[in-house]
Curated annotation (Swiss-Prot):
It is an enzyme of class 3 (hydrolase). The gene is rnpA. This is Ribonuclease P protein component. One of its GO terms (molecular function) is tRNA binding. It comes from Bifidobacterium longum subsp. infantis (strain ATCC 15697 / DSM 20088 / JCM 1222 / NCTC 11817 / S12). RNaseP catalyzes the removal of the 5'-leader sequence from pre-tRNA to produce the mature 5'-terminus. It can also cleave other RNA substrates such as 4.5S RNA. The protein component plays an auxiliary but essential role in vivo by binding to the 5'-leader sequence and broadening the substrate specificity of the ribozyme. Its EC number is 3.1.26.5. Consists of a catalytic RNA component (M1 or rnpB) and a protein subunit.
Length: 119
């Protein structure tokens, strides 16, 4: 899974207002219009992380980001082949257990896949 790097990419995903979430996370997603069909064998998923200072100090924020990266890679097969994802942490993510975050991300990614399949 590649990274969303530019501010423009983050803004594009966040402006679309398509999201799924749980108690501790919000998943914003964008599927490009020209990649709705899965005939193309290449996979192009990009991940961005948004962890604000309301989550905690730098050490806490970095811990949350590290957990998000690991969990996103573990569950990326649930996502459509071509999509941009921004995982946004709520302040409660700092105290959430790894198992809880794992379940929430799996459920949110499955919800994203379901919503994209319906569209």
């Amino acid at each position: 899974m590649e990274r969303l790097q530019s501010h423009r990419d983050f803004v594009t995903v966040l402006k679309r207002r398509r999201k799924a979430g749980g108690k501790d996370i919000v998943v914003h997603y964008l599927v490009p219009d020209d990649h709705h069909d899965d005939d193309d064998r290449t996979v192009h998923r990009r991940l961005g992380l948004a962890v604000s200072k309301s989550v905690g100090h730098a050490v806490t924020r970095n811990t949350v980001k590290r957990r998000f990266r690991v969990l996103a890679r573990a569950h990326e097969d649930l996502l459509p082949a071509h999509c941009d994802i921004v995982l946004r942490a709520k302040p409660s993510a700092a105290t959430a257990s790894f198992v809880s975050l794992d379940q929430q991300i799996a459920k949110a990614f499955a919800t994203v896949a379901h919503k994209v399949a319906e569209a």
